[in-house]
């Protein structure tokens, strides 16, 4: 997992450039140290990929065209594909650290046009009203997903079978939606 302190854009665009994102495994894991970003925020941006995140510590605010959501430590969520969003660190008492899985839906769905994509993935990623799906402790089903999410960041990329284990974990979480 790579520690990140800034965001990069494609030239002339608000589309985020995702360093290390490869076609043969369309996924990156990041540990965003939001207190180290200029102004303690990530400016407006978007990406074709899905963003699945967990708040390790602190709290952040997600802004989208549809509104604002606050995510304290222990919560998480999904930012849908192609959603314009920004985040800002809120906590001033502890570090604001966000763990992120950023991936192309093909990682879960397989080949474009597959039955899995059509039946389970496309209805979510093509729904413009779904910008962010929040996950908070206190709801049994959401807590189950949050535990899987937190555990998914402890998988070691050096371990044999990492890619298979990670994809299976992401699929298990996606199935819960």
Predicted regions and their residues:
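Amphipathic, well-ordered alpha-helical segments in soluble domains
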Residues: 51-54, 117, 144, 148, ...
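Generic protein-terminus/edge-of-domain signal
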Residues: 1-63, 67-75, 83, 118, ...
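Short, Lys/Arg-enriched, Trp-marked, Pro/Gly-tolerant hinge/linker segments that flank
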Residues: 131-143, 155-177
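Short histidine-centered beta-strand/loop micro-motifs
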Residues: 40-46, 63, 88-90, 111-113, ...
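Residues at helix-coil transition
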Residues: 57, 126, 154-157
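A hydrophobic/aromatic-rich effector-binding and dimerization subdomain
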Residues: 2-10, 17-24, 83-151
């Amino acid at each position: 997992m790579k520690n990140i302190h800034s965001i990069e854009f494609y030239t002339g665009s608000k589309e985020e450039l995702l360093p290390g994102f490869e076609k043969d495994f369309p996924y990156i894991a990041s540990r965003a140290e939001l207190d180290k970003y200029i102004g303690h925020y990530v400016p407006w941006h978007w990406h074709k990929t899905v963003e699945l995140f967990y708040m390790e510590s602190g709290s952040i605010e997600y802004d989208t065209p549809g509104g604002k959501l606050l995510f304290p430590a222990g919560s998480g969520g999904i930012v849908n594909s192609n959603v314009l969003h920004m985040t800002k660190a809120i906590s001033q008492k502890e570090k604001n650290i966000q763990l992120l899985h950023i991936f192309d839906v093909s990682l879960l769905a397989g080949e474009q046009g597959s039955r899995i994509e059509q039946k389970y993935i496309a209805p979510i990623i093509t729904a413009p009203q779904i910008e962010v799906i929040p996950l908070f402790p206190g709801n049994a089903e959401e807590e189950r997903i949050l535990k899987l999410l937190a555990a998914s960041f402890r998988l070691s990329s050096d371990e044999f079978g990492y890619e298979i284990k990670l994809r299976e974990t992401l699929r298990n979480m996606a199935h819960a939606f």
